[in-house]
């Protein structure tokens, strides 16, 4: 009765996931990411903050299909999950530094002019302000490496791979954001 009075019966999934879903909705305009079958066509798959192998079993066969077709699987997670163990690369990021890593990757992409300028002009607002913030030295890979525990060279390589996915003759990048990112301070 207590939770009913609070309106908790109206929560989309769980109280913990609702905040993240509201944030995603405000930024992307939709709560859902790519359909699981879309991952089969990816050239680079980033699993960020989750154990897909154990917790998204419906997605795993599509990731396996993509890998059979040459896709790389990179897991960004402080924990060595089963998914991380099966990945081509596991980036064991320091707890609570996911946002810093994302900003570091964006810094590289914008500094090197790897962004999709046509898409940005057509589909976004506020990009000039975002770019000014992202290009600050505090978001440079060398600074981000100190916070995240991920080498600056790795941040640069991952940013370039993400930006160039789909341009390299293989499929585009597909990112699976999971709830682990929103469940600690300073995360994405």
Model regions: which residues?
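Cofactor-pocket helix-loop regions in the catalytic cores of large enzyme subunits
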Residues: 1-188
